[in-house]
Regions:
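N-terminal anchoring/stem segment of glycosyltransferases
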Residues: 1-69, 79-88
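Intrinsically disordered, low-complexity linker/assembly segments
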Residues: 73-77
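Short beta-strand-to-loop acidic/aromatic patch adjacent to the donor-nucleotide binding site
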Residues: 86-99
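Short His-Asn-centered micro-motif
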Residues: 12, 40-42, 92-93, 115-117, ...
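Non-transmembrane alpha-helical segments in soluble domains
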Residues: 26-29, 95, 139
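Short glycine- and hydrophobic/aromatic-rich loop-to-beta-strand nucleating segment
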Residues: 134-141
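Short, flexible, glycine/charge-rich loop motifs used to bind or transfer phosphoryl groups or to couple energy/partner
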Residues: 27-28, 78-80, 102-105, 129-130
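Conserved donor-nucleotide/metal-binding helix-loop-beta segment in metal-dependent transferases, i.e.
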Residues: 96-129
Length: 141
């Protein structure tokens, strides 16, 4: 088992069906002891899933509404850090989670973000502050 006390495993899912997200969370937890594990979800899901707390998953509501894909993306970029108390976090999703924990490399902690770079496009990927974003597609950060 790998110990990563400075890494929070985190996921955001405000839908009615957490099964894919929980698969990603539990699969990621199977070979790694994270400093914290958090699921950002609705109050209804928190009320209906007390077993998750027993399994060591802290459940929190989002600090702003997430109603669609654009809200989700905005939330992850601008609000996810409000839920993280460790130096790093690993965001998992139903289609992106840890499969081979034995491949972990502590050198990854030297980077502030690991994700796929996007090509520069003059009129695209601009944040609300006018800055161009050139990375996306989730990753270890």
């Amino acid at each position: 088992m790998i110990n990563l006390p400075d890494v929070t495993l985190i996921s955001v899912d405000t839908t009615d069906d957490l099964s894919g997200t929980l698969n990603g969370v539990y699969t990621s937890m199977s070979g790694i002891n994270f400093g914290d594990v958090k699921l950002i979800t609705t109050q209804e899901q928190i009320d209906n899933n007390p077993k998750l707390v027993e399994d060591g998953i802290t459940m929190q509501t989002p600090v702003r509404d997430i109603k669609n894909y654009n809200d989700y993306n905005y939330y992850v970029v601008y609000h996810l850090h409000e839920h993280v108390d460790t130096s790093h976090c690993l965001l998992v999703q139903p289609d992106g989670f840890v499969l081979f924990p034995d491949k972990w490399d502590d050198a990854w902690l030297e980077y502030d973000y690991i994700g796929a770079p996007w090509a520069f496009v003059e009129d695209a990927y601009i944040d609300p502050f006018g800055r161009h974003w050139r990375v996306g597609n989730g990753g270890f950060s």
